[in-house]
Amino acid sequence: MIIKPRIRGFICTTTHPVGCEANVLEQINITKAKGKIANGPKKVLVVGSSSGYGLSSRITAAFGSDAATLGVFFEKPSSETKPGTAGWYNSAAFDKFAKAEGLYSKSINCDAFSHEAKQKAIELIKEDLGQVDMVVYSLASPVRKLPDSGELIRSSLKPIGEPYKATAVDTNKDIIIEASVEPATEQEINDTVTVMGGEDWELWMQALAEAGVLADGCKTVAYSYIGTELTWPIYWHGALGKAKMDLDRAAHALDDKLSATGGSANVAVLKSVVTQASSAIPVMPLYIAMVFKKMRAEGLHEGCIEQINRMFSERLYKADGSAAEVDESNRLRLDDWELREEIQQHCRDMWPQVTSENLAELTDYREYKEEFLKLFGFGIEGIDYEQDVNPNVEFDVVSI
């Protein structure tokens, strides 16, 4: 079929398999260009490995450290009438390139919140790897099916206490709007913590530990974002922030357990990037377009893959073997460049000035849109989008 982008809300409902493969290859090449990671991990489980920071973690482990990787994700293959999800094609491309270099790669396509996902991962680790020395937890899901009761719990992207009003961009119409979001109820806050908090990370680590598949010295990391006062009302001080604070709680509990065998658990606070997850958060697209322009001008711009490479080589797996620098809450901070005062001051100055007319001039909004489409395999140089492509891509994946 000939596949063109179709946007609905903050999701592109079509994907291009050749474009997704090109994205993965680009990340692999960036990783290889940085050279091998000294003392890097060798057997890595990535929970949430099909896009964004999770995909970049799998790529960095494999192509920066020659690691065997097991990826867990929830994606859809193509049907007769529509292409598969971007994460399906990303994972297929990763599998193809990893195997071409003789690297172990297996994937599990299922609900990562389920008991079955954990049991299947343990089974494959025991059969193929013995143990893992790194576990990356990178799930971003709006819904969690509780594994025992089967109840569906939904997260909310809402402020707490009072309505949130702010300048934002309507990414469908490309105009500046005043966004208004009603505050979360107590139930919505609790539900967001249930979906996006640290409980499932703990359940994964507990299951892996009880099965004896965590190597001594195993490191685990989960991803978070804190941001600044520009995004705090909707993010860190909102329902999502409460969930991310619960991730901090889980990290401390896990670190206490893992440190007994020389391991560690950390939350890594990462910079804002264009992902399917961030595009759903009110105000984030405008903030990202603004902060990217300034960071590019200062030579500080990083995408997912650059961030994760820096986390591996300059935090968790330093060449000299020294311990990672952490903040007062034992977090790895990779948002350090974004939070520089001159970067944030620029955004504070720009915010009241931006209009629909000067949006493209004052910010990198055009680039934001291009990067958003790239997530789904579109707008990539060198690809002929008039070509007929086969949307049916198979790879080494266990679907349960």
Swiss-Prot record:
Q: Where is this site: Plays an important role in discriminating NADH against NADPH?
A: 75
What EC identifiers does the entry list? 1.3.1.9
Catalysed reactions, as listed in the record: a 2,3-saturated acyl-[ACP] + NAD(+) = a (2E)-enoyl-[ACP] + NADH + H(+)
Xref: InterPro entries: Eno_Rdtase_FAD-bd_dom, Enoyl-CoA_Rdtase_cat_dom, FabV-like_NADH_b, Trans-2-enoyl-CoA_reductase
A GO term, aspect molecular function? enoyl-[acyl-carrier-protein] reductase (NADH) activity
Q: Which residues form the active site?
A: 235 (proton donor)
Cited Pfam families: Eno-Rase_FAD_bd, Eno-Rase_NADH_b, Enoyl_reductase
A biological process (GO) annotation for this entry?
A: fatty acid biosynthetic process
Which pairs are disulfide-linked? none
Instruction: Look up keyword Oxidoreductase and say if it applies.
Output: yes
Ligand binding (substrate): 225
This protein's pathway? Lipid metabolism; fatty acid biosynthesis
Which superkingdom, per the lineage?
A: Bacteria
Which residues bind NAD(+) per the record?
48-53, 74-75, 111-112, 139-140, 244, 273-275
Name the UniProt key words of this record, in alphabetical order.
Fatty acid biosynthesis, Fatty acid metabolism, Lipid biosynthesis, Lipid metabolism, NAD, Oxidoreductase
Q: What task does this protein carry out?
A: Involved in the final reduction of the elongation cycle of fatty acid synthesis (FAS II). Catalyzes the reduction of a carbon-carbon double bond in an enoyl moiety that is covalently linked to an acyl carrier protein (ACP).
Q: Which family does it belong to?
A: Belongs to the TER reductase family.
User: What is the annotated quaternary arrangement, including any partners?
Assistant: Monomer.
Q: What is this protein called?
A: Enoyl-[acyl-carrier-protein] reductase [NADH]
